[in-house]
Amino acid sequence: MARYTGPDCRLCRREGMKLFLKGTKCFSEKCPFERRPFPPGQHGRAQRKLTEYGLRLREKQRAKRIYGVLERQFRRYFEIASKGRGVTGERLLQLLETRLDNVVYRLGWALSRAQARQIVSHGKIAVNGKRVNIPSYNLKPGDVVELLDKDLIPVQEAISVFGNKSVPAWLELDRENLRGKVLRLPKREEIDTPVQEQLIVEFYSR
Protein backbone atom coordinates (compact mmCIF):
# COMPACT_ATOMS: atom_id res chain seq x y z
CA MET A 1 0.00 0.00 0.00
CA ALA A 2 1.38 3.43 -0.93
CA ARG A 3 2.37 5.79 1.85
CA TYR A 4 4.36 8.97 2.37
CA THR A 5 7.95 8.23 3.40
CA GLY A 6 9.48 11.72 3.45
CA PRO A 7 10.23 13.96 6.46
CA ASP A 8 7.09 14.68 8.48
CA CYS A 9 8.37 18.07 9.62
CA ARG A 10 8.64 19.16 6.00
CA LEU A 11 4.86 18.73 5.72
CA CYS A 12 4.30 21.09 8.66
CA ARG A 13 6.47 23.72 7.00
CA ARG A 14 4.62 23.28 3.72
CA GLU A 15 1.26 23.85 5.45
CA GLY A 16 2.54 26.78 7.51
CA MET A 17 1.45 25.27 10.81
CA LYS A 18 2.24 22.45 13.21
CA LEU A 19 0.39 19.28 12.24
CA PHE A 20 1.69 17.40 15.31
CA LEU A 21 2.95 14.43 13.32
CA LYS A 22 5.99 13.65 15.50
CA GLY A 23 4.57 13.30 19.00
CA THR A 24 6.57 14.97 21.79
CA LYS A 25 9.10 16.42 19.33
CA CYS A 26 6.40 18.85 18.17
CA PHE A 27 6.26 20.34 21.67
CA SER A 28 10.03 20.70 22.07
CA GLU A 29 12.65 23.17 20.87
CA LYS A 30 13.88 20.48 18.46
CA CYS A 31 10.82 20.99 16.27
CA PRO A 32 12.13 22.23 12.86
CA PHE A 33 9.01 24.35 12.40
CA GLU A 34 10.08 26.48 15.38
CA ARG A 35 13.36 27.32 13.66
CA ARG A 36 12.07 27.55 10.09
CA PRO A 37 8.36 28.44 10.03
CA PHE A 38 8.25 28.87 6.26
CA PRO A 39 7.77 26.49 3.30
CA PRO A 40 10.73 24.28 2.33
CA GLY A 41 12.75 24.88 -0.80
CA GLN A 42 14.88 27.63 -2.33
CA HIS A 43 12.02 30.12 -2.47
CA GLY A 44 10.37 29.13 0.79
CA ARG A 45 10.63 32.59 2.35
CA ALA A 46 9.06 34.35 -0.63
CA GLN A 47 5.60 35.81 -0.07
CA ARG A 48 3.19 34.32 -2.57
CA LYS A 49 -0.49 35.12 -2.86
CA LEU A 50 -2.55 32.00 -3.41
CA THR A 51 -5.32 31.84 -5.98
CA GLU A 52 -8.75 30.52 -4.98
CA TYR A 53 -7.75 27.16 -6.41
CA GLY A 54 -4.52 27.29 -4.43
CA LEU A 55 -6.36 27.99 -1.17
CA ARG A 56 -8.70 25.05 -1.72
CA LEU A 57 -5.82 22.77 -2.67
CA ARG A 58 -3.84 23.74 0.45
CA GLU A 59 -6.83 23.03 2.69
CA LYS A 60 -7.30 19.61 1.13
CA GLN A 61 -3.60 18.80 1.44
CA ARG A 62 -3.58 19.93 5.07
CA ALA A 63 -6.47 17.62 5.99
CA LYS A 64 -4.83 14.69 4.19
CA ARG A 65 -1.57 15.23 6.01
CA ILE A 66 -3.13 15.66 9.44
CA TYR A 67 -4.95 12.34 9.17
CA GLY A 68 -2.19 10.58 7.21
CA VAL A 69 -4.40 9.73 4.23
CA LEU A 70 -3.27 9.66 0.60
CA GLU A 71 -5.23 11.16 -2.32
CA ARG A 72 -7.06 8.09 -3.58
CA GLN A 73 -8.44 7.19 -0.17
CA PHE A 74 -9.21 10.81 0.71
CA ARG A 75 -11.22 11.23 -2.47
CA ARG A 76 -13.12 8.05 -1.68
CA TYR A 77 -14.03 9.51 1.72
CA PHE A 78 -15.30 12.63 -0.02
CA GLU A 79 -17.42 10.58 -2.43
CA ILE A 80 -18.97 8.67 0.47
CA ALA A 81 -19.60 11.91 2.37
CA SER A 82 -21.20 13.60 -0.63
CA LYS A 83 -23.66 10.74 -1.09
CA GLY A 84 -24.66 10.51 2.56
CA ARG A 85 -27.09 12.53 4.62
CA GLY A 86 -26.14 15.82 6.24
CA VAL A 87 -23.52 18.43 5.41
CA THR A 88 -20.82 16.99 3.13
CA GLY A 89 -17.90 18.73 4.84
CA GLU A 90 -18.97 17.68 8.32
CA ARG A 91 -19.63 14.14 7.16
CA LEU A 92 -16.14 14.02 5.63
CA LEU A 93 -14.57 14.98 8.95
CA GLN A 94 -16.69 12.40 10.76
CA LEU A 95 -15.38 9.68 8.45
CA LEU A 96 -11.80 10.77 9.13
CA GLU A 97 -12.36 11.05 12.89
CA THR A 98 -13.88 7.58 13.20
CA ARG A 99 -10.93 5.85 11.55
CA LEU A 100 -9.51 3.31 13.99
CA ASP A 101 -6.05 4.89 14.03
CA ASN A 102 -7.52 8.31 14.80
CA VAL A 103 -9.68 6.94 17.62
CA VAL A 104 -6.62 5.24 19.16
CA TYR A 105 -4.90 8.64 19.02
CA ARG A 106 -7.93 10.46 20.46
CA LEU A 107 -8.09 8.00 23.36
CA GLY A 108 -4.55 9.04 24.30
CA TRP A 109 -2.89 5.71 23.51
CA ALA A 110 -0.45 7.17 20.97
CA LEU A 111 1.59 10.38 20.74
CA SER A 112 0.69 10.89 17.08
CA ARG A 113 -1.64 9.47 14.47
CA ALA A 114 1.35 7.87 12.75
CA GLN A 115 2.21 6.02 15.95
CA ALA A 116 -1.44 5.02 16.36
CA ARG A 117 -1.41 3.67 12.80
CA GLN A 118 1.61 1.52 13.65
CA ILE A 119 -0.01 0.18 16.83
CA VAL A 120 -3.09 -0.86 14.85
CA SER A 121 -1.04 -2.35 11.99
CA HIS A 122 0.88 -4.51 14.46
CA GLY A 123 -2.35 -6.10 15.66
CA LYS A 124 -2.42 -4.55 19.13
CA ILE A 125 -6.05 -3.38 18.94
CA ALA A 126 -9.35 -5.26 19.15
CA VAL A 127 -12.76 -3.96 18.08
CA ASN A 128 -15.76 -5.63 19.72
CA GLY A 129 -13.48 -8.43 20.90
CA LYS A 130 -11.90 -9.15 17.51
CA ARG A 131 -8.36 -8.19 16.53
CA VAL A 132 -8.29 -5.52 13.79
CA ASN A 133 -5.07 -4.48 12.05
CA ILE A 134 -6.52 -2.06 9.49
CA PRO A 135 -5.85 1.59 10.47
CA SER A 136 -8.55 2.88 8.10
CA TYR A 137 -11.25 0.68 9.68
CA ASN A 138 -14.23 2.97 10.31
CA LEU A 139 -15.88 2.64 13.70
CA LYS A 140 -19.59 3.02 14.38
CA PRO A 141 -21.49 4.21 17.46
CA GLY A 142 -21.46 1.41 20.01
CA ASP A 143 -18.14 -0.09 18.89
CA VAL A 144 -15.76 -0.97 21.72
CA VAL A 145 -12.01 -0.55 21.19
CA GLU A 146 -9.57 -2.39 23.43
CA LEU A 147 -5.79 -2.42 23.73
CA LEU A 148 -4.57 -6.04 23.62
CA ASP A 149 -1.03 -5.36 24.85
CA LYS A 150 -1.51 -3.06 27.83
CA ASP A 151 2.22 -2.94 28.61
CA LEU A 152 3.19 -1.72 25.14
CA ILE A 153 5.93 0.88 25.66
CA PRO A 154 4.64 3.50 23.15
CA VAL A 155 1.20 3.33 24.78
CA GLN A 156 2.61 3.75 28.27
CA GLU A 157 4.68 6.71 27.07
CA ALA A 158 1.59 8.33 25.56
CA ILE A 159 -0.40 7.78 28.75
CA SER A 160 2.37 9.36 30.83
CA VAL A 161 2.48 12.40 28.52
CA PHE A 162 -1.27 12.93 28.19
CA GLY A 163 -2.02 11.99 31.81
CA ASN A 164 -5.68 12.50 32.67
CA LYS A 165 -6.38 14.65 29.64
CA SER A 166 -10.06 14.37 28.79
CA VAL A 167 -11.13 12.55 25.64
CA PRO A 168 -13.64 13.99 23.13
CA ALA A 169 -17.27 13.89 24.31
CA TRP A 170 -18.20 11.42 21.57
CA LEU A 171 -15.83 8.85 23.05
CA GLU A 172 -15.80 7.04 26.39
CA LEU A 173 -12.57 5.85 28.00
CA ASP A 174 -12.04 3.24 30.69
CA ARG A 175 -8.54 4.23 31.81
CA GLU A 176 -8.09 1.29 34.17
CA ASN A 177 -8.82 -1.40 31.58
CA LEU A 178 -7.58 0.60 28.57
CA ARG A 179 -10.87 0.25 26.77
CA GLY A 180 -12.74 2.85 24.76
CA LYS A 181 -16.18 3.16 23.24
CA VAL A 182 -17.63 5.22 20.41
CA LEU A 183 -20.76 6.80 21.89
CA ARG A 184 -21.88 8.62 18.75
CA LEU A 185 -20.56 10.43 15.70
CA PRO A 186 -18.70 13.65 16.55
CA LYS A 187 -20.38 17.02 16.03
CA ARG A 188 -18.47 19.61 14.02
CA GLU A 189 -17.78 21.77 17.07
CA GLU A 190 -16.18 18.77 18.79
CA ILE A 191 -13.59 18.28 16.04
CA ASP A 192 -10.55 20.47 16.71
CA THR A 193 -8.80 19.73 13.41
CA PRO A 194 -7.73 23.13 11.96
CA VAL A 195 -9.27 22.81 8.50
CA GLN A 196 -11.99 24.65 6.62
CA GLU A 197 -13.87 21.70 5.22
CA GLN A 198 -16.04 23.86 2.94
CA LEU A 199 -12.93 24.71 0.90
CA ILE A 200 -12.31 20.98 0.45
CA VAL A 201 -15.87 20.49 -0.75
CA GLU A 202 -15.40 23.35 -3.22
CA PHE A 203 -12.13 21.82 -4.44
CA TYR A 204 -13.74 18.51 -5.37
CA SER A 205 -16.91 20.16 -6.70
CA ARG A 206 -15.14 22.44 -9.16
Curated annotation (Swiss-Prot):
GO biological process, alphabetically ordered: ribosomal small subunit biogenesis; translation
Do you know which InterPro entries this protein is assigned to?
Ribosomal_uS4 (IPR022801), Ribosomal_uS4_bac-type (IPR005709), Ribosomal_uS4_CS (IPR018079), Ribosomal_uS4_N (IPR001912), S4_RNA-bd (IPR002942), S4_RNA-bd_sf (IPR036986)
Instruction: State a GO cellular component annotated for this protein.
Output: small ribosomal subunit
Tell me how this protein assembles.
Answer: Part of the 30S ribosomal subunit. Contacts protein S5. The interaction surface between S4 and S5 is involved in control of translational fidelity.
Matching entries from SUPFAM superfamilies are given as: Alpha-L RNA-binding motif
HAMAP family, alphabetically? Answer: Ribosomal_uS4_B (MF_01306_B)
Q: Which residues form the S4 RNA-binding domain?
A: 98-155
Going by the UniProt record, its keywords in alphabetical order are: Ribonucleoprotein, Ribosomal protein, RNA-binding, rRNA-binding
Family assignment from sequence similarity: Belongs to the universal ribosomal protein uS4 family.
NCBIfam families with a match to the protein in the record = PRK05327.1, rpsD_bact
Stored Pfam families: Ribosomal_S4 (PF00163), S4 (PF01479)
Write the protein's name.
Small ribosomal subunit protein uS4
Domain of life where this protein originates: Bacteria
